[in-house]
């Protein structure tokens, strides 16, 4: 009879030494991001990166509601206002300069969207939390001034979330897809024919081909080209001018890059991820007119701070609605 010492034994080595091992994407082109700017020595749930027409970067922290404004040239950080709504999750900028802020509310039924100036003045409810049951996480404008938003509700076995389109006059809300589990990131292709959506707690990437009206799905047009692995799942996303999609992986300290057909073609790693640091990567965004990508993450779980990281992407960022 073999002793316990003689038995085949598993050892931590190679990928199994990592807190967040990469298995299925290990052969992809892989680069490691460089630190760009420390937002706080405290762990803040950073999200919502977006640049205005003057090249100023706006972002927020979800749990405390701070809205930050950063000058990329000087790296000066300002806090122009604090969200009056609970748990803001994304900022998008209208071509008229207003900030549209998505908020999650109580994470059940009191989310919405409000608009404000860059200083937090002239508040306007766009989607009111009192008259809806949404938990709004993110949005993307089309060239007509309407927008798509994600409903962040549900969980893996109770898919209550979905994606909706709001008309340019903000009066009509049309469902695009429903019954998905925590709809999160959303991006629109350069020709506005394809809508990308990440489904966080089901670890899926949706590719939705749209008719010219922007709300009707083409025959067989709603597909799932990719299933992610690991904890927690895909988060916010953006596109470049070649229609590549950049998806932040929350809880994994990395960004995955897909081509316009949904095939993975590259990945960006956050330093320290193998040791369990800076895993809460939430949002990638391009500096306008460049291929320089900014990524936000934080180290709440390990008692660390909140950082922005940077790399160069495959192509320049797409000039979206606020620049048109």
From Swiss-Prot:
Keywords: Calcium, Cytoplasm, Hydrolase, Metal-binding. It is an enzyme of class 3 (hydrolase). Its EC number is 3.1.1.-. Ca(2+) 1 binds at residues 47, 137, 184, 235-236. One of its GO terms (cellular component) is cytoplasm. It is found in: Cytoplasm. Optimum pH is about 6.0. Binds 2 Ca(2+) ions per subunit. Changing residue 138 to A: Decrease in lactonase activity. One of its GO terms (molecular function) is metal ion binding. Ca(2+) 2 binds at residues 109, 111, 129, 132, 134. Its main location: cytoplasm. The keyword Hydrolase applies. SUPFAM superfamilies: Calcium-dependent phosphotriesterase (SSF63829). Pfam families: SGL. The keyword Lipid biosynthesis does not apply. Belongs to the SMP-30/CGR1 family. Exhibits lactonase activity. Acts in cells with perturbed membrane integrity and is possibly related to the membrane homeostasis. This is Lactonase drp35.
